[in-house]
């Protein structure tokens, strides 16, 4: 059995969890998330805890049980506390601006880049060079942040581009004569 799957997921007060076959729905103050659990994983609910055990006859059961536990734990944290991801724009003239449900980015191209935010994700710009993404779905937050970063990835010589707040860009040395 996976080491991750051995630990049960505790369900805090104010969170409603519904298990319908292999479909798990978690509802809390930040919204509602649902996910289909792999058929090789058996989910048991008892007194405010969920346990995940691998089923016999499946090769991938051990790995899937740990994955399922981690995903459900992220869902519970997402609907209670939520997740945030911070992006920083580094470069002369690089700016971000909120326009309703979209982010307008000036990234050195001849045109502004507009990125529409999916449902469940909110953004704020504390300054022109910072973007803070918030939401309940950890995977979706990471995907939106990666999509925005992909418009202008940090280049290795000056470090200009869109980067995560905790990202360290290794700067290469310029060519010498």
UniProtKB/Swiss-Prot annotation:
GO annotation, cellular component aspect: cytosolic large ribosomal subunit
Transmembrane intervals: none
A biological process term (GO) from this entry: cytoplasmic translation
Transferase among keywords: no
Assigned keywords, A-Z: Ribonucleoprotein, Ribosomal protein, RNA-binding, rRNA-binding
Segment forming the signal sequence: none
One Gene Ontology molecular-function label: structural constituent of ribosome
Presence of keyword rRNA-binding: yes
Gene3D superfamilies with a match to the protein in the record: Ribosomal protein L6, alpha-beta domain
Family: Belongs to the universal ribosomal protein uL6 family.
Function: This protein binds to the 23S rRNA, and is important in its secondary structure. It is located near the subunit interface in the base of the L7/L12 stalk, and near the tRNA binding site of the peptidyltransferase center.
Protein name, entry field: Large ribosomal subunit protein uL6
Organism of derivation: Haemophilus influenzae (strain ATCC 51907 / DSM 11121 / KW20 / Rd)
